[in-house]
Design a protein with these regions (language model features):
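A short, N-terminal "cap"/entry segment at the start of jelly-roll beta-barrel domains
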Residues: 1-40, 123-130
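Conserved short histidine dyad/triad with adjacent acidic residue
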Residues: 28, 44-58
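Short strand-coil-strand connectors
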Residues: 39, 75-79, 102
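Structural motif
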Residues: 42, 71-73, 96, 105
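Histidine-centered catalytic micro-motifs
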Residues: 55-62, 95
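Glycine- and acidic-residue-biased ligand/ion/polar-headgroup-sensing regions
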Residues: 61-72, 77
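Short acidic-glycine-tyrosine-enriched beta hairpin
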Residues: 78-93
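Ligand-binding loop in jelly-roll beta-barrel domains
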Residues: 93-118
């Protein structure tokens, strides 16, 4: 038996490529996420289709993000910064932010602490009010 086969059986093992896992949420046209929440932290695997633009928004939770593949322009506060696979950022709670992609699109892993309550269930939009 291989190590990979043993891990596949573990209920705490997840895969970015397995779209059957996580809580699905459509954030905007061309942008969707799968959410994995623990008690104190939440992961969100966000798929940004090519040439998509997310709503600039804010929330009280701290957010870190890393681009797994593709590229984007990250807006944070009054700044816009080009980002590519391997780049990551930190966003304090309450700071406005958003992403727009090029023809490459992007996959982003977002990390929230504490977990966002509205993301603990299926839904749509960047917040519970959308």
């Amino acid at each position: 038996m291989t190590i990979a086969k043993d891990l596949k059986q573990a209920p705490w093992r997840f895969s970015i490529g397995d779209e059957s896992q996580g809580i699905f949420r459509k954030l905007a046209e061309g942008i969707s996420t799968r959410i994995f929440s623990g008690e104190n932290v939440m992961l969100s695997v966000v798929k940004h289709e090519p040439n998509s633009t997310g709503t600039v928004h804010s929330h009280p939770e701290e957010q870190w993000g890393v681009i797994i593949e593709g590229e984007c322009v990250r807006t944070q506060g009054d700044e816009e910064v080009p980002m590519k696979a391997g780049d990551f950022w930190s966003t304090p709670g309450g700071v406005t932010h958003g992403i727009r992609t090029s023809e490459l699109g992007a996959t982003v892993l977002d990390i929230f602490s504490p977990p966002r309550e509205e993301y603990k269930k299926h839904g749509k939009g960047f917040s519970s009010s959308v």
